[in-house]
Amino acid sequence: MTISPVSHNTRPESQLLPQEAAAFDLLDKLGIEYDRVSHDAAFNMELCAEVSRVLDVSVCKNLFLCNRQKTAFYLLCMPPDKPFHTKDLSAQIGSSRLSFAPEESLWELLRCHPGSATILGLANDTEHRVRLLIDREVCDAPFFSCHPCICTSTLKLKTADVLEKLLPHTGHTPVIVDL
C-alpha cells in the first residue's frame, strides 16, 4: 500500500468527492484541527495499521451495524485489535442480535461506502436514525482517527474535539460500551 510519508493539517488540494469535501468543510466550520495522511484505499485493518504508524494514532475500527429487522442502525467505533462479539454488544445496548448493515443503508444514512464508515458521516444522518456506540478505550484515548467519508485518507483528531464539538453539532450522543 502506498502511504504519503508526510502528514498534513489541511485538506487535499486535489478534486474531492462531495461527501469528502463536506467532511472537511464541517471540520473547518467547527474549528477542529486535524492531521491527515493520504494513502491507497484501506479496506481492512491490516492496511490501516501502516497508516497508524505514520499518524502515530491507533486507527479506529468502524462497523456499521443493524438489528435483524433492519429498523435500528448503529455506528460502532472500537480499537482495531479488540474482538467483536455481536451477542455481547447486543446485550449491552438492549438490542436483538446485530449484523452488518446493508451497503445501501450505509450510503443512505452516512453517505459512505464500505471501508469508509466514519463518525464524520453522522453529519449526514440529520434524522438521527443511527446510534453511535464508542468503546470506552477509544473515548479514553487522547486522539481519535477516522476517514473523511472516503477510505483513501485518514485523519487524526483530538478525542475532546470529537466529543465536545463534532457530536454536539451532529446531535448524536454516544453510548459508551465495553467490548
Protein language model features and the residues they cover:
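Extended, low-hydrophobicity, polar/charged segments
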Residues: 1-179
